[in-house]
Amino acid sequence: MQRASRLKRELHMLATEPPPGITCWQDKDQMDDLRAQILGGANTPYEKGVFKLEVIIPERYPFEPPQIRFLTPIYHPNIDSAGRICLDVLKLPPKGAWRPSLNIATVLTSIQLLMSEPNPDDPLMADISSEFKYNKPAFLKNARQWTEKHARQKQKADEEEMLDNLPEAGDSRVHNSTQKRKASQLVGIEKKFHPDV
């Protein structure tokens, strides 16, 4: 019972006051199967990437941490190819730092911070960790390429679909109110995908 009421509160908080760059929602109608999305931080190799995560809430939550993994591939020393994350707040003590006072928003914010500040001394991917430590330009290049390939494809496809469905500027249909609405929606989509433009 405590789990269900707490999850309702947390989901409401995530829906009404999400942390910057983070969204989280229920997948289907199951309250314990969530999806999250983290936007890559500015001035990081993940900038403008949209990273999807799976959040599974265990039966003993909040006494056990949520199980979170990346669904979007990411080039990072603390995240392996299966999306598993090496982060202390995702583990119980004594090896971890999970406490029942923490919540899903806090954990997702911690993951967002880990994306900005990798911990090469506690890696899941030794080769990427070594590259991060000893050849940072190569790490940054590879991480940017992975972000471009895996975390930006969907948004590019969405942008292209919207652009393909818009009439030409000289087309008389532009004056149709539906087309005007679509054109204004495109401006909103462009701002969503390119907020600095």
From Swiss-Prot:
Q: Which cysteines are joined by disulfide bonds?
A: none
Q: Which Pfam families match?
A: UQ_con
Active site positions: 86
Induction profile:
Down-regulated following hypoxia. Up-regulated in breast cancers.
Q: How is it modified after translation?
A: Auto-ubiquitinated. Effects of auto-monoubiquitination at Lys-91 and Lys-182 are unclear: according to a report, monoubiquitination inactivates E2 enzyme activity. In contrast, according to another report, autoubiquitination does not affect E2 enzyme activity.
Q: Where is this region: Disordered?
A: 149-197
Q: Which UniProt keywords apply?
A: ATP-binding, Disease variant, DNA damage, DNA repair, Fanconi anemia, Isopeptide bond, Nucleotide-binding, Nucleus, Phosphoprotein, Transferase, Ubl conjugation, Ubl conjugation pathway
Tell me the impact of changing residue 86 to A. Loss of E2 enzyme activity
**Localization in the cell:** Nucleus
Q: Does the keyword Chloroplast apply?
A: no
Q: Report the InterPro entries cross-referenced here.
A: Ub_conjugating_enzyme, UBQ-conjugat_E2_core, UBQ-conjugating_AS, UBQ-conjugating_enzyme/RWD
| Keyword Cell wall biogenesis/degradation set for record | no
Report the residues modified as Phosphoserine. Answer: 184
Superkingdom as given in the UniProt entry: Eukaryota
Class in the EC hierarchy, top level? transferase
One of the record's GO molecular function terms: chromatin binding
Crosslinked positions for Glycyl lysine isopeptide (Lys-Gly) (interchain with G-Cter in ubiquitin)? 91, 182
Q: Which GO terms describe its biological process?
A: DNA damage response; DNA repair; protein autoubiquitination; protein K11-linked ubiquitination; protein K27-linked ubiquitination; protein K29-linked ubiquitination; protein K48-linked ubiquitination; protein K6-linked ubiquitination
Q: Where is this cross-link: Glycyl lysine isopeptide (Lys-Gly) (interchain with G-Cter in SUMO2)?
A: 191-192
Annotated coiled-coil positions are none
Clinical note on disease:
Fanconi anemia complementation group T: A disorder affecting all bone marrow elements and resulting in anemia, leukopenia and thrombopenia. It is associated with cardiac, renal and limb malformations, dermal pigmentary changes, and a predisposition to the development of malignancies. At the cellular level it is associated with hypersensitivity to DNA-damaging agents, chromosomal instability (increased chromosome breakage) and defective DNA repair.
Which proteins does it associate with, and in what oligomeric form? Directly interacts with FANCL. Interacts with BRCA1.
Say what the protein does: Accepts ubiquitin from the E1 complex and catalyzes its covalent attachment to other proteins. Catalyzes monoubiquitination. Involved in mitomycin-C (MMC)-induced DNA repair. Acts as a specific E2 ubiquitin-conjugating enzyme for the Fanconi anemia complex by associating with E3 ubiquitin-protein ligase FANCL and catalyzing monoubiquitination of FANCD2, a key step in the DNA damage pathway. Also mediates monoubiquitination of FANCL and FANCI. May contribute to ubiquitination and degradation of BRCA1.
Please report the name of this protein according to its UniProt entry: Ubiquitin-conjugating enzyme E2 T
Q: Which organism is it from?
A: Homo sapiens
